[in-house]
Amino acid sequence: TLNDNGPKYINSSKTKIFDKSSTLYGINLAKEGISNSGKVVLVEGYMDALTAHQYGYDNVVACMGTALTESQVRYVSVLTKQCVLALDADIAGSEATFRSIENSWKAFERVFVGKKNNTSLYKTTNKIDLRIAQFNFGKDPDEIIRTDKNSWENHINNSKPLLAYLIENAPRRWNILSNEGKQLATENIAPLILSIDNDYDRENYYSQFATTLNVEINVVKSAVISANKKNSTKNVVSFN
């Protein structure tokens, strides 16, 4: 749409011919690029994907929304196990961003782990690598690619693993200066930390989380274990 006060894109209603939830815009042009690069970059809108291909980034597709669906995950996973979510800067760090990440992660969980399985993607043999590319405020992928290709490439190449992104952005979600805020952050992030198989990777995330919360690492470890017991009946990722 051309009105800045309204939504960027208006899709038609679901029909037998068009179903937004099962469509990846540009996938017909991106298959070879995804195969060659070993990863897919997922953007929100049509223009983001169109501009990316015009400028030579042929592994970019649009998920036509802020979160991936199970149908889209199944399609993407056939081509690659590394997915980068390139978030629009106007929602990056906002509540909408975290809901989008949560829904995308849950879509991967349901496809690869199963609805009734309590394990995590980190423990599957699929080794899904879901990363987040966060851009400067006020810019979306379309604008960044047109004005600063180096910035686009740097952000994509230095995209953060999902858990690292969540830990880094914890202060945006909770008041971690308070003990209550620290507890809420821990309850949400604990299941992901504990689901990591590699001892060294898990220790690294403990260290990152301790730094973010400004507490000793042994305190974080104890709090994470306690929080995970409390949340044992909840989903792997639960944003409150």
Go through the PLM ranges and name each one:
Residues T1-C83, E95-S100:
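Phosphate-handling DNA/RNA-contact segment within nucleic-acid enzymes
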Residues K31-V40, A67-C83, L87-N240:
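A charged alpha-helical hairpin associated with nucleic-acid processing machineries
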